[in-house]
Regions:
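Gram-negative outer-membrane beta-barrel transporters
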Residues: 1-66
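Short sequence motifs at beta-strands and strand-loop junctions characteristic
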Residues: 3, 30-36, 90-98, 146-150
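N-terminal start-of-chain detector that recognizes signal peptides
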Residues: 14-15, 28-32, 75-77, 90-93, ...
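Extracellular loop and loop/strand-boundary signature of outer-membrane beta-barrel proteins
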Residues: 21-30, 87-91, 139-144
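Generic secretory/membrane-interface signal
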Residues: 33, 39, 45, 95, ...
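Intrinsic disorder/low-complexity detector
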Residues: 35, 41, 87, 103, ...
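C-terminal beta-signal and adjacent terminal beta-strands/loops
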Residues: 60-81, 97-101, 106-160
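Glycan-recognition and catalytic regions of carbohydrate-active enzymes
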Residues: 84
Length: 160
């Protein structure tokens, strides 16, 4: 890879196991025991004229799925709100989290200041990553809430 050519990359990966012993002496997962986290970042900068740069960047992120506590449907229906089955705390494994972000930017060097226009396309694949689940008293079922889907973020930055 030619870093002087405006290329960069970074790869990181972490493996872990984070159980705990519950008050009933059972080893359980925590909500955040995702078992692994991996990131890949890369990008390329292209010089345009003497003082301008166009950059294209990519970020891939994944983690093992989160553990949730199952909802007790009968108890939830009787109470009219979400009641969790605490005897099964953090036993329900969700799908792995995945997100891909793309960023395109144009930077102008203006003597003592810099102007940058960029467009971040967050979760460009619109992957539906589970955030939480709750009881819905209207339907009598479980509603799944997801993390942010595709989200474009235009930015203007002037540094002086």
């Amino acid at each position: 890879i030619c870093f002087r050519c405006g290329l960069y990359f970074l790869v990181s990966c972490t493996f872990s196991n984070q159980p705990y012993i519950s008050p009933d002496s059972v080893e359980r997962n925590t909500a955040y025991n995702t078992r692994y986290v991996a990131n890949i970042l890369g990008g390329k900068e292209f010089n345009v004229g003497d003082n301008n740069v166009i950059a294209l960047n990519l970020k891939l992120s994944t983690t093992g799925g989160r553990y949730l506590t199952p909802i007790d449907l009968e108890a939830s229906a009787a109470a009219g709100r979400t009641i969790y089955d605490e005897s099964q705390a953090y036993t329900q494994l969700q799908d792995a989290y995945f997100r891909m972000d793309v960023r395109l930017s144009y930077r102008m060097e203006l003597g003592a200041s810099t102007m940058e226009f960029s467009l971040d396309l967050q979760n460009v694949t619109n992957n539906q990553n589970v955030f939480t689940q709750s009881y819905n008293p209207r339907t009598g079922g479980i509603t799944t809430e997801y993390q942010q889907g595709f989200f474009p973020v235009p930015t203007f930055r002037w540094t002086f």
